Amino acid sequence: MELIVNGAPVTTPTGATLADVVRTVTDADRGVAVAINGEVVPRSGWPAEQLCDGDRVEVLIAAQGG
C-alpha cells in the first residue's frame, strides 16, 4: 500500500494501522499528534484506524526549545 507520510512516499503492508505507521516515525509515548487526510485522529483510535492506499498521514511531534 502506498501512503504519503509527512510529505514522503512510503510503502506499507496492506492492512497496516495508523499505530503501525506512527511507530515507523517515532517511538515517543507523549507529545505526538496524527492526522489522516487532514483529519486529526485521537490516540485511542490509532490501533483500530485502517489506512487506505493514497492516504496522507501527518505525524507531528512536540518539541521544547528556548
Residue ranges and their predicted role:
Residues 1-65:
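Ubiquitin-like/PB1-type beta-grasp interaction modules and other compact soluble beta-rich domains
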